A protein has these predicted regions:
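ABC family nucleotide-binding domain
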Residues: 8-220
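ABC-family P-loop ATPase nucleotide-binding domain
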Residues: 1-16, 225-234
Length: 234
């Protein structure tokens, strides 16, 4: 898929972030377009996860700006920022982070209920979404009863139930075998085509980076190069 040339869905402008005296992000700027998959690669400690946390409003930058759909996130209060995040951003992590006491259907429904939907409506939407992801026979299963690939598909369903525009994925295939990894990557591509989702994927894995339209190499908190996804320096 060619990279869209329309107005960026998201802009990251000159982001800095430090922890104590340790500077983690140093002047990061990037753009994400609608329907684009952007891979972020680099050595451990380069700042990749911190960058995702800042973009996703899970952490605040020391300096700089994140703009999504024309909205400056720094201008939003804490509650409004959380509501904006729930509407516009989904998260997928290497560790699925599903709640063990709840079924797959309940895990997926929870973000919809947090966003104001009734339990009945949220559960119906969760059920439909899980069926679309070939998990219709796993609705009442708890995480301990699911395979690694199934858990990640549940995590993806949870990430997209509120119809976000952007999915931030931190090493989403890191704990999967080669078959389950390929299934998850094909799911990302299908969701991009069917839902128009945009993805930012942090990865150390070449096959994961290869599905991206672009890859950015992060080194010591700076973007040092940009390539096509299939040219990522991994």
């Amino acid at each position: 898929m060619s990279i869209p040339t329309d107005t960026p869905l998201m802009e990251v402008r000159d982001i800095y972030k430090s922890f104590g005296r340790l500077e983690i992000l140093r002047g990061i700027s990037l753009e994400l377009h609608r329907g684009e998959i952007l891979a972020i690669v680099g050595a451990s400690g380069a700042g990749k996860t911190t960058l995702l946390q800042v973009i996703g409003t899970l952490d605040a930058p020391d300096r700089g700006e994140v703009i999504i759909g024309g909205e400056r996130l720094s201008a939003l209060s804490g509650d409004r920022r959380a509501a904006f995040r729930n509407r516009h951003i989904g998260f997928v992590f290497q560790s699925h982070q599903l709640m063990p006491e709840f079924t797959a259907e309940e895990n997926v429904a929870i973000p919809a209920m947090i966003s104001g939907k009734s339990r009945r409506e949220a559960m119906a939407e969760a059920s439909e979404l899980l069926r679309r992801l070939s998990l219709g026979d796993r609705l009442d299963h708890r995480p301990a009863e699911l395979s690694g690939g199934e858990k990640q598909r549940v995590a993806v369903a949870r990430a997209i139930i509120n119809h976000p525009e952007i999915v931030l994925a931190d090493e989403p295939t890191g704990a999967l075998d080669s078959v389950r990894k390929r299934e998850l990557l094909e799911l990302f591509l299908r969701l991009r085509e069917e839902e128009g989702l945009s993805f930012i994927v942090v990865t150390h894995d070449r096959e994961t980076a290869e599905i991206a339209d672009r890859s950015l190499l992060l080194s010591y908190g700076r973007i040092v190069s940009e390539q096509r996804g299939d040219e990522a320096p991994i």
